[in-house]
Amino acid sequence: MTIWIILGIVVVLIIAVIGMYNSLVQSKIKVDNAWSQIDVQLQRRFDLIPNFVETVKGYMTHEKETFEKIASLRTSWANANSVSEKAELDNQLSTTLKTIMAVSENYPELKANQNFSELSEELRNTENKISFSRQFYNDTVTMYNTKLQVFPSNIIAGMFNFKARDLFKAE
């Protein structure tokens, strides 16, 4: 009789460990998926930028330094691997694009340019998608990181080497 009780407890513990492990794996996959959604939108924005810069360059001749910074950020972003690196570069690029948009107010002929208007609208839409994706990613990471820290899943997370993820911080 005692052997059956011990065996029952062991089976319940094994099932609990498997359940917690699977829950952690599912959460990790959700985090990876949420990151890929941000990555897609960031790539879309980086793909729009060369056309935007070419459109603006002819009008904003005094902004050469800004355009060089954008080119440098694009190169750095292509080589960035971690979430924190990409978040930092994204923040710098967002600030630079806001500067260009603000300066464009001083160029009425640029604002009247159809290509500029269309690209500006596409960039704004992409920025909104990035913002939404960032929020979803951070929510998903928060849930995942919470699972890594609460008992008893923290024990399973430690046993199977699950690591906390960084939030995508915007400035």
Q: Model regions: which residues?
A:
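A helix-centric hydrophobic-segment signal that preferentially recognizes long
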Residues: 1-171
